UniProtKB/Swiss-Prot annotation:
PANTHER family: EXODEOXYRIBONUCLEASE 7 LARGE SUBUNIT (PTHR30008:SF0). This is Exodeoxyribonuclease 7 large subunit. Keywords: Cytoplasm, Exonuclease, Hydrolase, Nuclease. Its main location: cytoplasm. It comes from Geobacter sulfurreducens (strain ATCC 51573 / DSM 12127 / PCA).
Length: 447
């Protein structure tokens, strides 16, 4: 009798299949918590890792269809809570957990995804101040990326029309939450940059939960803002809400209404600024005029009396003329003495030829002396005229020729340069370009 005739003999595959059926039937949906180790993320998009605690471990796999929905990236050492079903991997004869959903232990998945992306972009320098573009002080065209039906666009338009109705507004309607919202927002930012028709851009929406605002935490939106050549103002949610877009944007506004107030100044503010600048310009002009007036007064005080200068020059000309006359007379006397000596010698020797030569020499010397004297006098006269012309240019007389006058207080005839030295009833004399005039002071002012 065959001892194996009543026994059921299974193949390895059959046994494995039976075990898999038992496990999958009894552990169809289980929640398990543990620590991640041996995490692998191949190009296929699947996740392979081990979930362990202090006493045991189980292999886990999460296929690409499920892993692509994750908002955060699991890491070795991270505590996870996973949901899945227990199955058997036939090729190794090992049981494993087929994970359908997972979340970080102790913190929400979205919050962890926010922290991870923020740290990554900060390391890449997307939040650095050197990338922040200045907001134009008075934009002509403003682009708005938001929902066409939300409260945000209404608030933005209301504030802009109230503060500066002349500004042109271009609205790019997009989804601001749900599937596809991040793609639409990033595309709208790129479109505005592609066409380049605006000066500044507002990107935002009204308040909501973390899930509602999540499109503004997506990496594609952050990178679209960072590569924008047009300055971007983020205006997402309420004042307490912060998104990744806020950190990347060139300026963060706490609400859409605040963004509209930041992007344009009101007409009243601009008018007040212009009045302030006008006042500064007038004050500066008055100060410059006062400084130039002081410099002119200083120059007038430093100049000597032109008539005295001309008198000194005339006296020097007379002195030089007298010296020339004396020099000429002495020269003539010397030559006359020489002539007399020659005449005496000629009378003694009676040489006709020598006498004629001596006469010619005397005539030549006299002519040369006269020429030199004339040249010297002409040169001196020319220098005198040039000096007189230069003095006339610097003289207050030239200024008086343009309508100015010199004021002398009577009876002491002292020069007046400050109205504070005059009082009503004082007698003054005006020195004009031609002539003088007596006047009586009726009033005086320092302006």
């Amino acid at each position: 009798m065959d001892i194996f005739s009543e026994k059921r003999i299974l193949t390895v595959s059959q046994l494995t299949s039976l075990i898999r059926g038992v496990l999958e039937e009894n552990f169809e949906h289980v929640w398990v918590e543990g620590e991640v180790s041996n995490l692998a993320t191949p190009a296929s998009g699947h996740l392979y890792f081990t979930l362990k605690d202090g006493a045991a471990q189980i292999r886990c796999v999460m296929f690409r269809a499920s892993s692509r929905a994750l908002k955060f990236r699991p890491r070795d050492g991270m505590g996870l809570i996973v949901r899945g079903r227990v199955t058997v991997y036939d090729q190794r004869g090992e049981y494993q957990l087929l994970v359908e959903y997972l979340e970080p232990r102790g913190i929400g998945a979205l919050q962890l995804a926010f922290i991870q992306l923020k740290e990554q972009l900060a390391r890449e320098g997307l939040f650095a101040d050197e990338h922040k573009k200045p907001i134009p002080p008075l934009p002509q065209k403003i682009g708005v990326v938001t929902s066409a039906t939300g409260a945000a666009i209404h608030d933005i338009l209301t504030v802009l029309n109230r503060r500066f109705a002349n500004v042109e507004i271009l609205i790019r309607p997009v989804k601001v939450q749900g599937e596809g919202a991040a793609e639409e927002i990033a595309a709208a930012i790129d479109d505005f940059n592609r066409y380049g028709v605006i000066d500044v851009m507002i990107v935002g929406r009204g308040g909501g939960s973390l899930e509602d605002l999540w499109a503004f935490n997506e990496e594609m939106v952050a990178r679209a803002i960072h590569r924008s050549r047009i300055p971007v103002i983020s205006a997402v949610g309420h004042e307490v809400d912060f998104t990744i877009a806020d950190f990347v944007a060139d300026l963060r506004a706490p609400t859409p209404s605040a963004a509209a107030e930041l992007v344009v100044k009101s007409k009243e503010e601009l008018a007040a600024r212009l009045e302030f600048l006008r006042h500064r310009l007038v004050q500066g002009g008055r100060q410059v005029l006062a400084e130039r007036r002081g410099e002119l007064d200083s120059l007038n005080r430093s100049l000597r009396d032109p008539s005295m200068l001309v008198g000194h020059l005339s006296q020097r000309v007379d002195d030089l003329s007298a010296r020339l006359e004396r020099g000429t007379a002495n020269s003539v006397r010397r030559h006359r003495g020489s002539l007399d000596l020659l005449t005496t010698n000629l009378r003694l020797t009676n040489p006709a030829v020598r006498l004629e030569r001596a006469r010619e020499r005397v005539i030549a010397l006299a002519g040369r002396n006269e020429t030199l004297l004339r040249r010297f006098l002409d040169h001196l006269r020319e220098k005198t005229l040039v000096a007189a012309a230069r003095l006339d240019t610097l003289s207050p007389l030239a200024t008086m020729a343009r309508g100015y006058s010199i004021v002398l207080k009577l009876p002491e005839r002292c020069l007046v340069t400050d109205s504070a030295r005059l009082a009503p009833g004082d007698r003054v004399e005006l020195c004009l370009r031609r002539g003088r005039a007596g006047c009586c002071v009726e009033s005086s002012s320092d302006t």
